Amino acid sequence: MLYKRNPQLNKNGELIHLLSIEGLPKDIVTHILDTATNFVSVQEREVKKVPLLRGKSVFNLFFENSTRTRTTFEIAAKRLSADVFNLDIARSSTAKGETLLDTIDNLSAMAADIFVVRHSESGAPYLIAQHVAPHVHVVNAGDGRHSHPTQGLLDMYTIRHYKKDFSNLTVAIVGDVLHSRVARSDIHALTTLGAAEVRVVGPRTLVPSDMAQMGVRVFHNLEEGIKGCDVVITLRLQNERMSGALLPSSQEYFKSFGLTPEKLRLAKPDAIVMHPGPINRGVEIDSAVVDGPQAVILPQVTFGIAVRMAVMSIVAGNEA
């Protein structure tokens, strides 16, 4: 019944779209991470290409700004030997009033095989996935506050790389959880993979009321929230999504919730520090932590290419 209800899976329980980590069986999440391991080695070769998507067309549709996600998706598709097309939204017919689905129909008529979609509206990738032909696949690159599944997966890959086993891990997600699609994806992924304890840490105004229902512990004090943690994931303040004065100032936020070397000492000595980017130094995290030995922020970016290669190669191999 799970497979029939989940629009990401076909009738055989195979992944045909990646829309959200929520509802994905553990074996599929693990399969993506295992497949990504094979692609990490590709990036270490002199010729960083494999022919798995040769002849396939990947369309990147980013209706919101992006650096890391858009670029790593483009690199990932090219390393799979796909033909990659980046739609310039500002100059496209969408800017002239064309509907999202009409845009999709026109690009589908150009023989698109995979759509990578980032959109400000939650649910937009789901709408596209329900609309496209059975042989076309949709990968969610972030939709509103809802989900950012490939970021969640690359975060899990990074954690697994450094910590091996999730079952004994305590993970703290610190910052603007309210507006963060990454936080929700990470929580679902950590829960699916059996993390011992997941915490969210932030001001009361930036922590959603449903966090406890998601099986996480909520802290409104940074020192208490990261004490004894194995992994600390910091999130930026998403001022572009804030409609009111949820915080007094960035300086006040840093004073209470900014991750400094002194505060990081409350976590375990071998704790790793992660950040999905973009980083706002001196707001959610101190430069000394970003550039310090416990930060694995740049490896996250590197692993992100392999994870996105894994996702596209897996969905492209399955039919609806």
UniProtKB/Swiss-Prot annotation:
One MF annotation (Gene Ontology) recorded for this entry: aspartate carbamoyltransferase activity
UniProt pathway: Pyrimidine metabolism; UMP biosynthesis via de novo pathway; (S)-dihydroorotate from bicarbonate: step 2/3
The reaction(s) this protein catalyses: carbamoyl phosphate + L-aspartate = N-carbamoyl-L-aspartate + phosphate + H(+)
GO BP terms, alphabetized: 'de novo' pyrimidine nucleobase biosynthetic process; 'de novo' UMP biosynthetic process; amino acid metabolic process
Pfam short name (any one): OTCace_N
Positions annotated to bind carbamoyl phosphate: R68, T69, R118, H148, Q151, G277, P278
EC number of this enzyme: 2.1.3.2
Coiled coil: none
Domain of life: Bacteria
Keywords: Pyrimidine biosynthesis, Transferase
UniProt keyword Metal-binding present: no
Gene Ontology CC annotation, any one: cytosol
Binding site for L-aspartate: K96, R181, R236
Function, in words: Catalyzes the condensation of carbamoyl phosphate and aspartate to form carbamoyl aspartate and inorganic phosphate, the committed step in the de novo pyrimidine nucleotide biosynthesis pathway.
Subunit field text: Heterododecamer (2C3:3R2) of six catalytic PyrB chains organized as two trimers (C3), and six regulatory PyrI chains organized as three dimers (R2).
Annotated family: Belongs to the aspartate/ornithine carbamoyltransferase superfamily. ATCase family.
Name of the protein this chain belongs to: Aspartate carbamoyltransferase catalytic subunit
Organism name: Acidovorax ebreus (strain TPSY) (Diaphorobacter sp. (strain TPSY))
Lineage of the organism: Bacteria, Pseudomonadati, Pseudomonadota, Betaproteobacteria, Burkholderiales
